[in-house]
């Protein structure tokens, strides 16, 4: 057998030509310090700001401080298994969270991992947690109402889809309850809700989730939970993770409501991180970019232009004050970023006025344009009536001689306060709110005893749904007031037949 050297050499040349050695080049650094959710690494000279980094044990971190010799890293999750000398490598991407319909009805942590014990979340979509907010030309003005179901808000401080409305007040004044009631009221409104719990007790979050589930609100709600026992970096990124999940729906033409409960705790977590990273402290030891922390988050809420699908994301950030001081550093920052605030007052709360909304300090800067015509008509003089009542109430403490006009204003004011009260987790449909406020502002309730107002309201709604359903349907469908003569006649008929509780008791005792 003869060996053909030409064939062998051709075969070797062909194999050499096809040989391709793939080299994986990675920039790797070494951990020089770790503790309190923070790590420092040497050797990552080309790392980018906010880049996702991977530790040798599989944990992840985010590059925060880019210094001459070191990179300051916040560790996402547990840091106990990371040691000095461990390797850390660049990934070339920024942090992303899973998004999409699969998250609806679930409770997740800020990394998008389920914490409700109901199995894994099957979605292949992800979004970066940091994203540039829509520009001026990508937005349109707020024009659609977002009904909270709370008379005091929908009448006095209306909210529109795409608005940022701050809920502010001392601890235990009902801030979370306002947000939860608003989420419950979105049932059937084609709205996806996201509740971001930042630093809230695990037991409290469990209670809120059970409440949402009981009222069927988890069918359209995602809960993002970062508990107080978790490292500060997770509390810091939680609102951005929630915003990324909301943007997935917003950019697909859907409407989103996102609640940040609360941003005071996120600011405290960011202060902790910044001090550990040895950034220069400023006022109240917060870093210099604390304003940017909240502005870049809240600016992501918007009503998109029709060219981009017309979707919206409405933000309800919550801020906790100390002794009602809304002029403190973080409260004034967030007030200046948002489109209005709902101020909840301790004195009102403890006196039984719930929701404890202070009409004088609460304002909505853009929601008025989104308010329905019916609500605008019936609530026109409400704020003025309420503020004049507060003044007269203070004045009457010094004397009891009042003329008839002043007494009438006081009587109307007492009934206004009573009408605006609402039981917990009982949001009212828009048409029922409109009718009771119409009855109030047109004097139908002036002779109803204050203690019977809630019973009167409930009875009036039942009566109109049974005997004047066409009027209620008209308000519901057109969002305008129907024929006022018919409405007056229906309310008058019910009012004349309404028996106050005291009178009913007297009749029973006579028998």
Swiss-Prot record:
Binding sites annotated in the UniProt record for ATP: 169-176
**Which N-terminal residues, if any, form the signal peptide?**
none
Highest rank taxon of the organism: Bacteria
Family, according to the entry, reads as follows: Belongs to the ATPase alpha/beta chains family.
Catalytic function, reaction form: ATP + H2O + 4 H(+)(in) = ADP + phosphate + 5 H(+)(out)
Q: Where is this site: Required for activity?
A: 362
Mind telling me which Gene3D superfamilies this protein's record contains? Answer: 2.40.30.20, ATP synthase alpha/beta chain, C-terminal domain, P-loop containing nucleotide triphosphate hydrolases
- One annotated GO molecular function: proton-transporting ATP synthase activity, rotational mechanism
Gene Ontology CC annotations of this record: plasma membrane; proton-transporting ATP synthase complex
Name of the protein in its database record? ATP synthase subunit alpha
Tell me where it mainly resides.
membrane
Cell location: Cell membrane
Question: What does the record note on quaternary structure?
Answer: F-type ATPases have 2 components, CF(1) - the catalytic core - and CF(0) - the membrane proton channel. CF(1) has five subunits: alpha(3), beta(3), gamma(1), delta(1), epsilon(1). CF(0) has three main subunits: a(1), b(2) and c(9-12). The alpha and beta chains form an alternating ring which encloses part of the gamma chain. CF(1) is attached to CF(0) by a central stalk formed by the gamma and epsilon chains, while a peripheral stalk is formed by the delta and b chains.
